């Protein structure tokens, strides 16, 4: 069996108000190739945008990869490496029997992981990590796009 290609992914989410207009950004790096992704929604939360950054990056991969995914969101990292196992066992309910917030995004992230081997890394946000800073800028661009979308819709 051949070795999987290694891709580094850097993600971030942002929200102006929580809830409010939000954006997400991701950088995918494979060797010397790099791709930037961004998007936004007019009414969302920071946690949803953090999830969308990871989902969108993983869904953009065209074949199975070894992924090193860097996020400044403890919510995403802890959720996908720990909490999700209990949620799935409990029918997408928390330990106190409440519905999991953002369950549809967690399910989408779980599905996006399936073809890949992913190592999750937490990086401190706004601490000078170049790729995290760039992902943050892409996320803020996504917020601006979402604001425009909101204003156009009225």
UniProtKB/Swiss-Prot annotation:
Q: How is the cofactor bound?
A: Binds 1 Mg(2+) ion per subunit. May bind a second metal ion at a regulatory site, or after substrate binding.
What EC identifiers does the entry list?
A: 3.1.26.4
Q: Which residues bind Mg(2+) 1?
A: 12, 50, 72
* Localisation: Cytoplasm
What PANTHER family does the annotation carry?
RIBONUCLEASE H1
What are the cysteine partners in each disulfide bond? none
Q: Which domain of life is it from?
A: Bacteria
**Assembly and partners?**
Monomer.
**What is this protein's record name?**
Ribonuclease H
Q: Name one GO cellular component term.
A: cytoplasm
Query: According to the UniProt record, what class of enzyme is this?
Result: hydrolase
Concerning its family, UniProt says: Belongs to the RNase H family.
> What reaction(s) does this enzyme catalyze?
Endonucleolytic cleavage to 5'-phosphomonoester
The residues that hold Mg(2+) 2 are 12, 136
Q: Which UniProt keywords apply?
A: Cytoplasm, Endonuclease, Hydrolase, Magnesium, Metal-binding, Nuclease
Cite the PROSITE patterns for this sequence: RNASE_H_1
